[in-house]
C-alpha cells in the first residue's frame, strides 16, 4: 500500500507567495523596455501562458506545491553566510554571501525551472524545451523534467558544449536530449534562436522553459517572480541577522535572472533601498569588442522578442558576446535591468575575464567555496568597492552557483598553474 499524503501535506512553516511588483505594465513593458516582438503565430501561445501564469500565481494549491518542492527538493531557504575571512581581507564592509550555490543542481536556476515545470504540467504540456549557455539552466530543466515525467530537449551552442562537457553529460544522464547548435557564434544566443524555432513549430504540445529574464512578455515577469525568492529571503535574513537591510547588493548580470531575483524585492521600496550593483562581463576589455557588457557598451534594440540593451554593429547585426563565463556571454540584458539602468534604480559595472579568475581563486582560498565563474564576476567587483566602505556597513553578494562546472575550463585557461 502506498503512502497517502494528508490534505495540506505540502504546507511547511511559511507559505510562499509570488510578489506583485509595480512593473511590467499591462503590455509587458518596463518603461520603454520589454514587450512582445514575435511572429504572429506565437501571440496566442504567449497570451495563453500569461493567463495561465496569472491564474496559477493566485492559486493556493499551486503555490503550496511550488513551496514544497523549493524546500524539500531544491533545498530552500539558502543561508545568508557571513564571509568573515573575506571581510577581514578586504578590510571594509562586512560581506555576506547568499548561498544559491547550495541548491540542488548547484545554482539559482532551479527556483525558476520548478515554477515553470509546474506551470507546464498545469497547462497539460508534456514536452519541455530550453536553451542553455553554461549548462546550469539545461541541467535544471532536465532535472525538473525527470521529476515530473516530461519529455525534454535542450539546445546548446557547440562552443558551450565543449566548455561544459560535464553538464552535457549530466543532462543526458537525466534523460534529456541535448541538441548542439553550430550556427553563428555557437553560444547562448544561437541556442536561444533554435529553441524559439522549435517552439514555433511545436507550440501546441511544447512548453518553452526560458532560463533568464529575457524574451517576450510574460517571460521576464514570470522568471523574475520565480527568482524573487532570493531577495525576499535576504530581506528576512538580514533583519534576523543584523536588524536592518544591507547597504549594498551585488550580483553578476548576463541575461540577468540571479540579479533580478536579488534586486526586485528591494528595487521598488519607497525608502531605505540598498545600493543595487549589477556586474557585467567585460571579457577581454570593453574597448576590444570581446565582452558581454550590454548596458555598459551596448545600445537599445530588439532581440528574442524583447526591447532591451544589447550588442550589435553599425549594420544592425548582433555581435557575438564573449566571456570566460559561459553563462554571461549573452548579447543582451533583460528589460527590467535596462529600465533599472535608465531610471537609476541600480548601477551597472563590469569586470574582465582576468579579474573574474582572480575572484574565483580568492573565494576558494579565503572561504573554502569554489564559485561559479558567473558569481566570480560579482566577487571581483566587490573587491574594488568593499575596501572603500565602513566596517559597520553590510554588503550581500549573490553567490548564484557553484564552480564545479568551471574547474576544468579554469584549469585549461591557467595551464594547470595556480
UniProtKB/Swiss-Prot annotation:
Its cofactor is pyridoxal 5'-phosphate. Its EC number is 4.2.1.20. The modification N6-(pyridoxal phosphate)lysine is found at residue 109. One of its GO terms (cellular component) is cytoplasm. Pathway: Amino-acid biosynthesis; L-tryptophan biosynthesis; L-tryptophan from chorismate: step 5/5. GO terms for molecular function: tryptophan synthase activity. CDD domains: Trp-synth_B. InterPro entries: Trp_synth_b_CS, Trp_synth_beta, Trp_synth_beta/beta-like, TrpB-like_PALP, TrpB-like_PALP_sf. Keywords: Amino-acid biosynthesis, Aromatic amino acid biosynthesis, Lyase, Pyridoxal phosphate, Tryptophan biosynthesis. Belongs to the TrpB family. Tetramer of two alpha and two beta chains. NCBIfam families: trpB. This is Tryptophan synthase beta chain.
Amino acid at each position: 500500500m502506498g503512502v497517502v499524503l494528508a490534505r495540506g501535506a505540502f504546507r511547511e512553516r511559511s507559505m510562499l507567495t509570488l510578489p506583485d511588483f509595480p512593473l511590467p505594465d499591462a503590455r509587458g513593458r518596463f518603461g520603454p523596455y520589454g514587450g512582445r516582438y514575435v511572429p504572429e503565430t506565437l501571440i496566442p501561445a504567449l497570451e495563453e501562458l500569461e493567463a495561465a501564469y496569472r491564474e496559477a500565481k493566485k492559486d493556493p494549491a499551486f503555490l503550496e506545491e511550488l513551496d514544497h518542492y523549493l524546500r524539500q527538493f531544491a533545498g530552500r531557504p539558502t543561508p545568508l553566510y557571513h564571509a568573515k575571512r573575506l571581510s577581514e581581507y578586504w578590510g571594509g564592509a562586512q560581506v555576506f554571501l547568499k548561498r544559491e550555490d547550495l541548491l540542488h543542481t548547484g545554482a539559482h536556476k532551479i527556483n525558476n525551472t520548478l515554477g515553470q515545470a509546474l506551470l507546464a504540467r498545469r497547462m497539460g504540456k508534456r514536452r519541455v524545451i530550453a536553451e542553455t549557455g553554461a549548462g546550469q539552466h539545461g541541467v535544471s530543466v532536465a532535472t525538473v523534467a525527470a521529476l515530473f515525467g516530461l519529455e525534454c530537449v535542450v539546445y546548446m551552442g557547440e562552443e558551450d558544449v565543449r566548455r561544459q562537457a560535464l553538464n552535457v553529460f549530466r543532462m543526458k544522464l537525466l534523460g534529456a536530449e541535448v541538441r548542439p547548435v553550430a550556427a553563428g557564434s555557437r553560444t547562448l544566443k544561437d541556442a536561444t534562436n533554435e529553441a524559439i524555432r522549435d517552439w514555433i513549430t511545436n507550440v501546441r504540445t511544447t512548453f518553452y522553459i526560458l532560463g533568464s529574464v529575457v524574451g517576450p512578455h510574460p517571460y521576464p515577469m514570470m522568471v523574475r517572480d520565480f527568482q524573487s525568492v532570493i531577495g525576499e529571503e535576504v530581506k528576512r535574513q538580514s533583519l534576523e541577522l543584523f536588524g536592518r537591510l544591507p547597504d549594498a547588493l551585488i550580483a553578476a548580470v548576463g541575461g540577468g535572472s540571479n540579479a533580478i531575483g536579488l534586486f526586485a524585492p528591494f528595487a521598488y521600496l519607497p525608502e531605505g533601498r540598498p545600493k543595487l550593483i549589477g556586474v557585467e562581463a567585460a571579457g577581454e576589455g570593453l574597448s576590444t569588442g570581446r565582452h558581454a557588457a550590454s548596458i555598459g557598451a551596448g545600445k537599445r534594440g530588439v532581440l528574442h522578442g524583447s526591447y532591451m540593451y544589447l550588442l550589435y554593429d553599425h549594420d544592425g547585426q548582433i555581435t557575438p558576446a564573449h566571456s570566460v563565463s559561459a553563462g554571461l556571454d549573452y548579447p543582451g540584458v533583460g528589460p527590467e535591468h535596462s529600465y533599472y539602468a535608465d531610471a537609476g534604480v541600480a548601477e551597472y559595472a563590469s569586470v574582465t575575464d582576468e579579474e573574474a579568475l582572480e575572484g574565483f581563486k580568492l573565494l576558494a582560498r579565503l572561504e573554502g567555496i569554489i564559485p561559479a565563474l558567473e558569481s566570480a564576476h560579482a566577487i571581483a567587483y566587490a573587491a574594488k568597492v568593499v575596501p572603500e566602505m565602513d566596517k559597520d556597513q553590510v554588503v550581500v553578494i549573490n553567490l548564484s552557483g557553484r564552480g564545479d562546472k568551471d574547474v576544468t575550463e579554469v584549469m585549461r585557461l591557467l595551464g594547470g598553474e595556480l
